[in-house]
């Protein structure tokens, strides 16, 4: 019987070397309101690239499932150079959903600017990339709803990536 209430998930496999679907977990990148994000790679060796694997928290509910499904659908519709890409999505053997996203090696935009003591012109060039990503999302009728420095990463070459559409609205 299916329940709409909270469902506990076994998190004993959520450690480096553990498997979630076809992905092997390498290290935890962060923890947020919906769950955790892990650096991962395909365990079967296909698609030799690292991904940011987004997983729900230990107690799973229908509402959280719907939010993850909405994020999946939103990301699938957004292909833009300044928005982290969705590569794969699915569920593992215990029914835990996952999103395999572009792994962006970068720093939050505020840290990037501060550590480099960027001039105003350079900061505005970064902000323009953010604005282009947001405008593109808006053109697809998507509102991010969680724009903050930790959701805007800047790579070593100065490219911006907008992350985390977890509470976005269509």
What are these model-derived regions, one by one?
Residues 5-170:
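Conserved ATP-binding/catalytic core of the eukaryotic-like protein kinase fold
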């Amino acid at each position: 019987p299916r329940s709409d209430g909270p469902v506990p998930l076994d998190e004993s496999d959520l450690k480096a070397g553990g498997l979630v679907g076809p992905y092997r977990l390498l290290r935890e990148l962060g923890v947020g309101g919906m769950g955790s994000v892990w650096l991962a790679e395909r365990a079967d060796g296909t698609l030799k690239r690292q991904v940011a694997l987004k997983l729900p928290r230990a107690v799973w509910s229908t509402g959280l499932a719907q939010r993850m499904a909405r994020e999946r659908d939103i990301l699938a519709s957004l292909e833009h150079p300044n928005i982290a890409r969705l590569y794969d999505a699915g569920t593992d053997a215990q029914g835990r959903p996952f999103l395999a996203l572009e792994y962006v090696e970068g720093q939050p935009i505020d840290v990037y600017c501060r550590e480099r003591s960027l001039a105003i012109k350079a900061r505005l060039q970064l902000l323009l990339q953010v604005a282009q990503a947001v405008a593109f999302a808006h053109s697809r009728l998507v509102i991010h709803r969680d724009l903050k420095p930790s959701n805007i990463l800047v790579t070593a070459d100065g490219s911006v990536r907008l992350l985390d559409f977890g509470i976005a609205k269509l």
